[in-house]
Amino acid sequence: MAPEAFARNFGPGAEPVRYPDPDIIGLDPRFPKLGNTPIRRHHLGTLWAEGPAWNGVGRYLLWSDIPGDEQLRWTEEDGKVSRRFRYPSGNSNGNTFDYQGRQISCQHGPRKVIRYEYDGSVTVLAEEFEGEGFNAPNDAIVHPNDGSIWFTDPGYGGLMNYEGNRLNTGSPQPIRKEAV
């Protein structure tokens, strides 16, 4: 058969893909058991999409465009995307919600982990460790037992110039280069 016979349209007007999709070959036999959720593209035009977080109460999906310095929001009710839901976003990366429904974001620009309060104000949860600034807070999660916020701080982001502000953080840098 010619390659055109297998061509699929994954563009904005494409129909949702349903599982099991015969064109997707899973290496792990458990993959088909993931369910029959359709794959849909809701937005085009993000420079670097990161940190998707679902808000079950508000019924919306939030994500970050790091170099675009914005957060976007897709709402289930109307299916629309709000550009610049939060702008500027501090070059936010990872996002999550705490058990009170407040948004937690890891910011590359100011190198902070923050929480957006109900009234729109911002609370800084962490911005340094042992007197040294962070590298680039990346992803966060809320611990299921005690509600504490756990986050990663890899040795990139603020140390690179991609986001326009190369920094000397003073934070510990990774020394192991090979996979462990």
Regions picked out by a protein language model, each given a short descriptive name:
Residues 2-180:
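Sequence-structural signature of mature extracellular/luminal beta-sheet repeat domains
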